[in-house]
Amino acid sequence: MLNQPPFLLSVYDYTGNWARPYIDAGWRVLLWDQHFEGSILEGFGRLVSLVEEENEGRVDGLLAAPPCTAFAASGARWWQYKDSPGSAEPPWESFTEQMVGLTLIVWEMVVRFRPRFWALENPVGRIEKLCPELKPFRRMSFNPCDYGDPYIKKTILWGDFNPNLPRNPVRPVEGSKMHRLPAGRRRSELRSVTPSGFARAFYKANHDLSINFASGRQLELFAS
């Protein structure tokens, strides 16, 4: 599509924080989240049709922040329940299986849309064990205080992108504030908000489409 701004797909980015710098820079951005879609499987089908019809199947960048509630090490004491049959609505047998399914949808998007760059984030935990497809693509880890937000929450990124983000380290004077959030329905949403400093740094390192982000691993993936 000639003379169109670049197109970014931001998945499970409920607040739009990670995509915000791209929006501000004039990129065309589509936010896609299970909170919007109802049935996530039907929603994925609609998304594929939308991208293929409206943007000729082209995706320049893909960002993904799958729900971490079955993966994060901070919630390990609940894994046994989340792994148990009956802990999710059909067609899923367990809550963990459902969360793995949401993550593998991102993998399917990468294979189908072949973005110029892509990144998936999750806190320290077991996502790589349950979704081994990600393992060859682990690129970096960070804490929000590395990029200007004064708290800690170690997060890992997988994908093919430029990991040389411009740092802006500050003292983590707010500590591990995410662990202190009150219990309630919004706790997981608040914990999943992408730190704004990291989002800006990621954009600065990953907006120039003249750079070839694709590694040998990704080229092998696309050739398969």
Language model feature labels by segment:
Residues M1-S224:
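Conserved active-site and SAM-binding loop architecture
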